[in-house]
Amino acid sequence: KADLLVANNVLAHVPEIVDFATGCGSLLSQDGVATFEFPHLVDLIASAQFDTIYHEHFSYLSLLATEAVLKSAGMHVFDAERIPTHGGSLRAFAQRTDAGSRLEEPGLHEIRRLEESLGVASSDFYSGFQNRADRISHDLSRFLLDAECNGEMVVAYGAAAKGNTLLNFAGVRQDLVQWVADRNPAKVGMFLPGSRIPIVDESEVR
């Protein structure tokens, strides 16, 4: 059995999240700790991080939702912290409910109070998200169109899922972004899905 189980940016990718969490709990020793790190729903909504929303992600988690998932899986969250990864993530620390050897930490209570005060469990918390996302899309398109009108060449670095989500949402094509550079040889020579922007080796940037 494991004394420490680390699952960074895994939960959001799992379609059967309670089943997965149950499996994690079964791997822990009696006093073992599991840590789960994932993009924090509070930051996703507050900053209109729509580029985090794509086909690989099945869940977008708050602390309150994570506590409910882990409770259903026979685990208990005893601590949590907010971290800056991916524009704002949450790292939760959990133990088996039959362990009961760790008290809840103040950081957990603080994040729980934050989410309750923001009303993450109500639909009002999510109102305005679409408008904020549309504004980001509009501003990006305006920037690229202005650059084109000024005779400037725009390229991108990193053929990642988030960037691809942003470009497709804004309707950006090769006429506005000529190419995207990436160091992954498996991507070089390919095209971004949807936008069809070619991917070149990062040496092109130098």
Predicted regions and their residues:
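Short catalytic micro-motifs in class I SAM-dependent methyltransferases
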Residues: N8-V10
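A short glycine-rich, Lys/Arg-flanked "PGG" loop and its adjoining helix->strand segment in the class I
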Residues: V18-V33
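Short, glycine-/aromatic-enriched active-site segment of Class I SAM-dependent methyltransferases
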Residues: F36-S59, L63-T66, L70
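Conserved S-adenosyl-L-methionine
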Residues: M75-H86
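A short, well-structured juxtamembrane/interface segment
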Residues: R132-N150
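A solvent-exposed beta-alpha-beta segment
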Residues: L145-R206
